[in-house]
């Protein structure tokens, strides 16, 4: 390779570093899956963001984790497919488009279904572009040649196939059920679209008279308007207060209808009066009770939240207006005898803000029990889906074991239209992939499918299924890992698993990596109402994508929430700045070296041996931790290696040979520096792709881009444990001298005498060999290294492993203060010895811990005892 010019500006500017780089990667096709038969495939499908607008910090976190995994796998030689795509997001998108129309004084009905859908597709195209530009700013290595959308023709085909197949197996049916109903958007809502808020309401206590005139029974409700649809009063079968009333009738006030008193174990005897009114058409629990007792279902509301003909004189009133009126009427009749304040959790529509109405409706459902059973069974086999952290498997199984049928129809226009037609004359239902031949005699179901129905097929529908011969399906399915938040385990993860098992016979992914929610610095959930949301694009503008990504990836452990803090992102920017400055210094001192000239065979300094040993340890640790998705630990490991070992120590020590006259030593140090920087950039690349590519392109390197450079390998022949030990001793000594200087306020520029009392000849020889470093970094006016050195009274001391440091500082120290300091240090070593001896006396620890761990504890004990004895001896001298 030709000599490389260094083109790194003196100052790190994230905007300049990140500008244009993503387009360069795309042009190079580095992110496209190759289908290379000599490589093992590795697949992730992106959780498709809603096409409705901006990505938030949760998306940035989720996609950064996926990018780290896929970049690392690509470097490890896998044929990586990271498939991008977006979700049509039924109600969310329709609500946005309807809002836009409202501003023009129009409704969707003014446009008609076809024109409205045209408008929605336009909206989709515009917002899909926004999302792609945000993915680009984050630096995500997505294969855009395979981008999918949940309403694509291919995915629509998969949706029809699944619907028809489940219908024919009797697993999809049409029936009445209580659903979450939004009276403003006039559609069913999934549980995730309902936001619960604490609301100050009232509990109304009513007396229903017994039909035979022998008394009355007390019930309480928060929704008195629903009493018009009551069809029973329920009590617990074991409740002695009411046993004699079971089977009797009560007369429903206002309505005059007679309804039975029934016994059901669902009733809580301790709550209120122990008797509850049952309205099967307006409450999910009452609906279940109604089914058990064969009660009629009387719906008293219209779809828009007004009262219907069953509400008699209240017909046409809004439900809340009706509540006020009915309360007045019940008070007049003496039925309502108490109103008490009551704070309770009320469901609101996430889209319209309306209070959600539990509402009896004819909808399409998936029969869940048989599908859930297969998913539960899978978790008892070796092929189970691995949850990381594994505690989330319990959450997942608990939901599957207590599953209810899934309402899949939505009263919307935007989405997958249900492939069912009703005969205009006979009412016969026809379900198939294509419309009936005599279409003029049939009317298609106007509803669309729940968005989650198509999302559940995402891992295989995106690969060409139902065409099981599709090359992508055969090569890249099942996928390897799904990265997602714990808040959608039920809505999405579980549904993908049971649909994957039902239609492909395979789990859709091997691992599910769960992350938490992004919270603000005070630990509060980010929300519009609190105004504490943060736009990731603003953070990128201020600090760069690399800083944001590194913070997001390393800021918490799997499954935990993440607290966003600008200070921490700024600290990460400082880390990037440190890397930039260190790399630039190294490159300025490479002397135009080429990749071919890189030679690690020359004679190395102790610092060279040490940094190569530390690099090997770091490669091994980072690789192992990343395989377990412990990215927080990876971050700490890389940070410590880069900031402390590489920048603060090695680069400083490398200045000795780099600025010296020995050309051979210079060449070796340059080679070590280039090799270590190259490997460090590769380790850091999945986290900080932009800055690492920029630096790597300036380093002597081989290959087109760091994105496809091989992942670093441990090279045992470059490790030298003996030299690393020597270096650790040097670092300990230099740190201790700096610490003492700080204590007595003596600047590093002022020379001081330094006596080093070593424990044996071996340590003395090692320090003598590396004396140049001690002279460079400790600035001694006099340097003595021996097994026996003078110990003047007025001296500061420090103890390190294998040596005691004595610094005669006549006139600079206070003997009393030094004794106090040493007594504190003695206390510290006493505690350490006690702690380690307690551990070594523990039978359980000795029996369970690996031999090398026990050996390490014994080594620590010996080290702490030696340090303690040295401090004791020094104290004795000072007190004489």
Curated annotation (Swiss-Prot):
Residues 809-880 form a coiled coil. Its EC number is 6.1.1.9. It catalyses: tRNA(Val) + L-valine + ATP = L-valyl-tRNA(Val) + AMP + diphosphate. Keywords: Aminoacyl-tRNA synthetase, ATP-binding, Coiled coil, Cytoplasm, Ligase, Nucleotide-binding, Protein biosynthesis. A motif ('KMSKS' region) lies at residues 525-529. One of its GO terms (biological process) is valyl-tRNA aminoacylation. Its main location: cytoplasm. PROSITE patterns: AA_TRNA_LIGASE_I. GO terms for molecular function: aminoacyl-tRNA deacylase activity; ATP binding; valine-tRNA ligase activity. ATP binds at residue 528. Gene3D superfamilies: HUPs, Isoleucyl-tRNA Synthetase, Domain 1, Valyl-tRNA synthetase, C-terminal domain, Valyl/Leucyl/Isoleucyl-tRNA synthetase, editing domain. GO terms for cellular component: cytosol. Signal peptide: none annotated. It comes from the Bacteria. InterPro entries: aa-tRNA-synth_I_CS (IPR001412), aa-tRNA-synth_Ia (IPR002300), Anticodon_Ia_Val (IPR033705), M/V/L/I-tRNA-synth_anticd-bd (IPR013155), Rossmann-like_a/b/a_fold (IPR014729), tRNA-bd_arm (IPR010978), tRNAsynth_Ia_anticodon-bd (IPR009080), Val-tRNA_synth_C_sf (IPR037118). Belongs to the class-I aminoacyl-tRNA synthetase family. ValS type 1 subfamily. Monomer. Catalyzes the attachment of valine to tRNA(Val). As ValRS can inadvertently accommodate and process structurally similar amino acids such as threonine, to avoid such errors, it has a 'posttransfer' editing activity that hydrolyzes mischarged Thr-tRNA(Val) in a tRNA-dependent manner. ValRS has two distinct active sites: one for aminoacylation and one for editing. The misactivated threonine is translocated from the active site to the editing site. The C-terminal coiled-coil domain is crucial for aminoacylation activity. This is Valine--tRNA ligase. It comes from Geobacillus kaustophilus (strain HTA426). The lineage of its organism: Bacteria, Bacillati, Bacillota, Bacilli, Bacillales. The gene is valS.
